[in-house]
C-alpha cells in the first residue's frame, strides 16, 4: 500500500506540466505584445518626444524582463519538479539549466521582480506630473517591500547554506 501511495505522489508531479505549458502560451502572448508595441510606435517615431520614446523603450524592457522570468520559471521548474530536459545538442543547452535549485529560483524570481518594479517606478517618475503623490508614494513603498523581501530571501538562503556547510 505504501509503495502505491509513494508512486502516486511521485507521479502527481506531472500535474505541473499543464501549468508550464500555460506559461509558454503566456510567453507567446507577451512576445506578440512586444512586437505590437514596436509596430504601434513606428508611424509616430519621428514626431515622438525623447521622453515618450524612453517610456516606450521602458515598456519593451519590462516585457523582456517578464519574458525572461517566464522562461526561467518554465525551464527550471520543469527540471526541478517534473523531469530533466533531455537536450541532445549540449551546445544549445543553456548554461544555467540543471544548476538551479528551488532557493536559487526564488532568489532569481525575487531579483527579477525588483528589476520589473524598478522599470515601473522609473516609468512612473517620468510621468510624475500626471500622477498623484499618494500613488507615487504607494508605488515606492511597494518597491521597497520587494527590495527588502529579495534581500531577506537572499540572506536566509545564504545563512541556510552556511549552516549546511558547518554541519
From Swiss-Prot:
GO cellular component: plasma membrane
This protein's name: UPF0114 protein in repA1-repA2 intergenic region
Keywords, in A-Z order: Cell membrane, Membrane, Plasmid, Transmembrane, Transmembrane helix
Regions that span the bilayer: 15-35, 53-73, 136-156
Family: Belongs to the UPF0114 family.
Taxonomic source organism: Buchnera aphidicola subsp. Acyrthosiphon pisum (strain APS) (Acyrthosiphon pisum symbiotic bacterium)
Membrane found in the keyword field: yes
KW Cell membrane (keyword) present: yes
Topological relation to the membrane, as annotated: Multi-pass membrane protein
NCBIfam families attached to this UniProt entry: HI0507
Name of one Pfam family that matches: UPF0114
Subcellular location: Cell membrane
